[in-house]
């Protein structure tokens, strides 16, 4: 029987680090638990199986018509602008695919990020005396860098003493440099918040920089949090609402 609800295809980058795929699958399980009526599939761009083209071929063979392809990315940079559209263009013509927006920025992501900081030992009362490093993966895309800077400003407005962006690759400054910079301003403590979804090489680089520079608090990655799962479903709903009526009836 034809299901008018589009399949949600979560597209992750993939990694040689097994923690990455484990986190992605844990997140998609949480999404399924929040919206049991929606079919959720996972595909990877590289390193992990199944690859996105394999998932799309299987869906087409099963008679699926409509797919919302959701990049599991916090920022709109190269993968969202180039890699993923190129892969989706190779899909079978019978599939009607809409690429959803990336996850960030979104208020729920900041909620998840602050919750990770509190889980790491901070409390809301510490905000006014804590310098915060917003550590992201990094990008050569100016738009992506500007978004991270804007998120840092938004966090500053929620009460943190100071918030500075840092990047694990492709852009400067690095995490250790920003930890030392904040320390030099005389804040009581310095905390590092990885603005990344899953463990892997770049988050490990963030952790190494934080520890090398003597950060007082290092939060965990966002991971398969309830907030992240809710943002995924919000992006799915936005894309579904934008589809032609015949695809959403």
Regions found by a protein language model. Name each.
Residues 1-249:
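Active-site-proximal alpha-helix that buttresses catalytic centers in soluble enzyme cores
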């Amino acid at each position: 029987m034809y299901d008018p609800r589009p399949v949600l295809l979560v597209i992750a980058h993939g990694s040689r680090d097994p923690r990455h795929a484990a986190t992605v699958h844990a997140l998609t399980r949480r999404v399924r638990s929040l919206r049991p009526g929606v079919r959720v599939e996972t595909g990877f761009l590289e390193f992990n199986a199944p690859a996105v083209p394999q998932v799309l071929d299987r869906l087409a063979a099963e008679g699926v018509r409509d797919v919302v392809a959701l990049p599991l990315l916090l920022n709109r940079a190269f993968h969202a602008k180039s890699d993923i559209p190129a892969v989706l263009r190779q899909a079978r013509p019978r599939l009607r695919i809409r690429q959803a927006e990336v996850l960030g920025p979104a208020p729920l992501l900041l909620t998840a990020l602050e919750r990770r900081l509190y889980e790491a030992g901070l409390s809301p009362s510490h905000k006014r005396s804590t310098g915060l490093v917003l550590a992201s993966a990094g990008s050569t895309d100016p738009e992506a860098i500007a978004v991270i800077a804007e998120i840092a400003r938004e966090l500053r407005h929620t009460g943190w003493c100071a918030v500075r962006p840092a990047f694990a690759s492709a852009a400067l400054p690095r995490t250790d440099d920003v930890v030392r910079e904040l320390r030099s301003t005389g804040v009581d403590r310095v905390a590092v918040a990885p603005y990344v979804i899953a463990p892997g090489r770049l988050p490990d680089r963030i952790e190494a920089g934080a520890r090398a520079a003597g950060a007082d608090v290092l939060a965990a990655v966002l991971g398969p949090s309830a907030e992240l799962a809710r943002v995924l479903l919000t992006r799915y709903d936005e894309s579904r609402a934008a589809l032609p009526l015949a695809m959403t009836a």
